[in-house]
Every structure is written in C-alpha cells, then in structure tokens.
From Swiss-Prot:
CDD domains: Ribosomal_L1. Part of the 50S ribosomal subunit. Binds directly to 23S rRNA. The L1 stalk is quite mobile in the ribosome, and is involved in E site tRNA release. Protein L1 is also a translational repressor protein, it controls the translation of the L11 operon by binding to its mRNA. The keyword Signal does not apply. Belongs to the universal ribosomal protein uL1 family. The keyword RNA-binding applies. This is Large ribosomal subunit protein uL1. GO terms for cellular component: large ribosomal subunit. GO terms for molecular function: rRNA binding; structural constituent of ribosome; tRNA binding. Keywords: Repressor, Ribonucleoprotein, Ribosomal protein, RNA-binding, rRNA-binding, Translation regulation, tRNA-binding. GO terms for biological process: regulation of translation; translation.
Length: 235
C-alpha cells in the first residue's frame, strides 16, 4: 500500500496520533489498517534511551514468541559431521562449512537466520562483514553459536526472534501477521517487550522505552503506550 494511495490515507485517518494505544488496541488497529490484498507482517519499532556507541549500552537478545511469527524462517547452519546431520534432521534449510562460506561470498543470502557450531566460528569470521550488517552473524549471546544445533534450528523455526539496537538506538522486530487474532499479537508483543526490558543496561539512565510504534508492512504507524506490556484482555 503506497503512502500516497487513497487506501493508505484512509487507513492513516483511523489512527489518532494524539494518543497512545494499549497493545491490544494497537493490534486491533494494525489489523484494521492493513491492506486486505496480502497477509502483511506486523512489526514493532522502539526508540530506546541508550547510547549504542557505548559498549555497556548495547541492547540485544532473543525471545520465543508464544504464537510464532507466522513465517517459517529459512535457517543456514555452519557445521560438519554429526552436527551437520543433526541440523539437517532438525529442518535446517542449508548446511555446510567452507562450501557454504564460499556460496555466501558469491552473493547467496537466501536465509533468515544463521547458526554455527563453536568450531566453525573462526571460518565464519571470514564473512562477518557480509553477515553482520544484515543481522545474520551467529553469536553466543543469541544462542546461535552452540553445539546443540538441532535445538537452535527448532527454536528459530518455532518462532524465536533476535533483536539488536541499531546505531540510532532503535529496535525493530516482528510479532506476527495481520491474519493473527489480536490477542495473539498482543501476547507476542508482551513476550518481546519483557525481553527488551530484561535487556536494559544497568548504565542506562532516564527513560528506557522512549517511543513504541506498531505497524504492518502495508499500514500506518500506531503509537503504543510504553508503560503497558501485558494487557491481553479488553479493558
């Protein structure tokens, strides 16, 4: 839905920019303002009160969304031998080592998440400049550098998402599809916000959640009250 289209403008008029919505209200409104032509993704954008330039204020983490994302993630795994077999059995979409690294160096990036066994990380480091900026670099803090590749694959396929603050102190993550019931979207939102709050750096001073906006990929932004995370039923 183009921002200049009549449909988008009509959808935007439904959003009261002078107020903050509860998570459940925002979920309902996201569904109402989404294009009916496709099952749009519902996203959350958060402005944090941190300085990402400081190492002790880096915010990152993972969360298993209780209702998944509505999309089956494509997972790449860097592993060999038994670990490679375990990854394939768990449903990994592509598994390899040097061959996979060469493929990525050649431009292949048809996956949503990457996992590596610890022994592969020295090799994977060769493509850090490719994977890092895209949020695809395996990292022990997000559980994507692990000897238990089968569990990591299953977690991601089951709706596990990663979040990481960018250089502008923003976080972006998915909480589902517009076809989800609003209560499921609100529960996914609450689970994700819990983890974001848990990841607050001790050195962060002042207001941590400065601004929260929920939107679909085809709809307008909906401002959400940052102080409310878990009102899953109608007020």
């Amino acid at each position: 839905m183009s921002k200049n289209s009549k449909a988008y403008k009509e959808a935007a008029e439904k959003v009261d920019k002078t107020r903050l919505y509860s998570p459940l209200e925002a979920a309902k409104l996201a569904k109402e303002t989404s294009s009916k032509k496709q099952d749009a993704t519902v996203e959350v954008a958060i402005r944090l009160g941190v300085d990402p330039r400081k190492a002790d204020q880096m915010v990152r983490g993972t969360v298993n969304l209780p209702h998944g994302t509505g999309k089956t993630a494509r997972v790449a795994v860097f592993a060999v031998g038994d670990k490679a077999e375990q990854a394939e059995a768990a449903g990994a979409d592509i598994v390899g080592s040097d061959d996979l690294i060469e493929k990525i160096q050649g431009g292949f990036l048809d996956f949503d998440a990457a996992i590596a066994t610890p022994d592969q990380m020295a090799k994977v480091g060769r493509i850090a400049r490719i994977l890092g900026p895209r949020g695809l670099m395996p990292n022990p803090k997000t559980g994507t550098v692990t000897p238990d590749v089968a569990k990591a694959v299953s977690d991601i396929k089951g709706g596990k998402i990663n979040f990481r603050v960018d250089k502008q102190a923003n976080l972006h993550f998915v909480i589902g599809k517009a076809s989800f019931d609003e209560s499921k979207l609100a529960e996914n939102y609450g689970a994700a916000l819990d983890e974001v709050l848990r990841a607050k750096p001790s050195s962060s001073k002042g207001r941590y959640l400065k601004k929260v906006v929920v939107s679909t990929t085809t709809g307008p932004g909906i401002p959400v009250d940052p102080s409310i995370t878990r009102n899953f039923t109608e007020e």
